[in-house]
Amino acid sequence: MRTTFQFTDGWKFHRGDLDETNYRAIHANRFKRAEWMKAGNHGISRVGYPDETWHDVDLPHDFVVASDYTPTANAVHGSLPTDVAWYRKTFELPAEIRHQRIHLEFDGIYRDATIWVNGHLAGSHLSGYTSFSLDVTELCDPNECNAIAVRCDAQEFELWSYEGGGIYRDVRLVATDDLHVPYSGTCIRSTFPDEADLSKVQIELQAQIHNAGREDRAAQVTFKIFADTGASPVYESSQAAPIAAGTSTAINHRLDLSQPTLWSIASPHLYRLETHVQVADKSCDIYHSHFGVRSIRFDADQGCFLNGESIKLKGVCNHQDHAGVGVAILPTIDEWRLKQLKAMGCNAIRTAHNPPAPHLLDLCDRMGFLVMNETRLSGTSPEFLGQLQALITRDRNHPSVCLWSLGNEEMLIQENAMGAKMLQRMQDLTHRLDPTRPCIYSANCDFNNIAENFVNNGFQIDTFGANY
């Protein structure tokens, strides 16, 4: 069964890079850095590494905000110097999860992060804003103490505003059965066959089921839909799902729901989906997802309609930093900020200019805000398309999300053929991952030339964004 542990307490922190990464490493007498020479050779991430002089910290943690202001640091980044930093943590696996698969989920590290466990490379992640998960099962010792080390390099900027540095969002350790729903593994789509009749909605459910074991499994997948706080399901359905060893299978189900309670700004009602995976009488996984039922559309002449009613979007560009804590934002801070915005008449948020913390979207779902969810950079490299895909697959179940933003003021490409083709490919990918929401691109400068360039190169953006 799935068990989730908050992995935020008891970390060690060192500011600055380390010239030597050896500790009881092979070839340590000949090289200062031998982590790429032998498996398990990364000393900083091994148990026993001397970190007594490192600082004790809890996550989320922004190490840049603790710096002294200096005129030599970049002013638009707060006149605070950035750096490379290291984090370390030792941990033991509780007895009840020692024979399960072990995953580490990171909501955000700024930036260019490399993660090591017990001397072994676990993974790397370039973006300072997208979330990711690592399966570290084989790297963990089920019976002994384990160690993790994270190196991040905040010296490169992604924005022209304060970005901080470090493991500045939540981290979780998640234990699962070999047979489980992977990270961001469900997709829930609500469509109305008749936009004029909101009493009947068609819901499409998809769950990815991954079998990390060495044997084929004859699974049973059950979808249960609840009102958010309800104890009894309003809908339930089961189906057989044979999953071959070492593979993932998408389980799809479609249902009609009558008289749904709609999600709206004034009444943000949520539903809860439980995806149950079992084999014979053994429960292998229960994966929780929240979603809302609502219709939203944009009309060039009449504007935005939510659940068939015309609304005005009264929004703000929401940069994630806050006084005193930098980018290490707790949900309580974002909740306070949203309450102030709600009192001012605000009903929409733009995640300027990057993927947000997951908790911000949870709050917008529950507090009744619409969200323009923005990827960090326009591009068609595997890295930038991967960032866009990670954003959409993580966030597409949130009813608050109403627009996918493909970029912001990309002055070098927005008026030429290359840019139109790049944005077209990004929009095509977005439509495949989520055909229920429109895309937007936030243009600046000469809107007429930009629009003409799009049309001349065969690109039709779903919603045209004009900044200034």
Feature-to-residue mapping (PLM):
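Short, solvent-exposed loop/linker segments at the N-terminal edge
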Residues: 190-201
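Beta-strand-rich binding/interaction modules
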Residues: 117, 199-241, 249-253
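Short glycine/proline/serine/threonine-rich loop/turn segments at secondary-structure transition edges
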Residues: 97-101, 140-145, 216, 257-272
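Accessory carbohydrate-binding/adhesion or oligomerization-edge regions at the termini
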Residues: 1-69, 147-153, 228-230
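Substrate-binding/catalytic cleft of secreted carbohydrate-active enzymes
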Residues: 338-343, 348-468
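Exposed aromatic-hydrophobic patches
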Residues: 131-138, 248-256
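N-terminal carbohydrate-binding accessory modules
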Residues: 185-186, 274-343, 362
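Accessory beta-strand-rich segments of carbohydrate-active enzymes
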Residues: 3-5, 12-18, 62-66, 76-190, ...
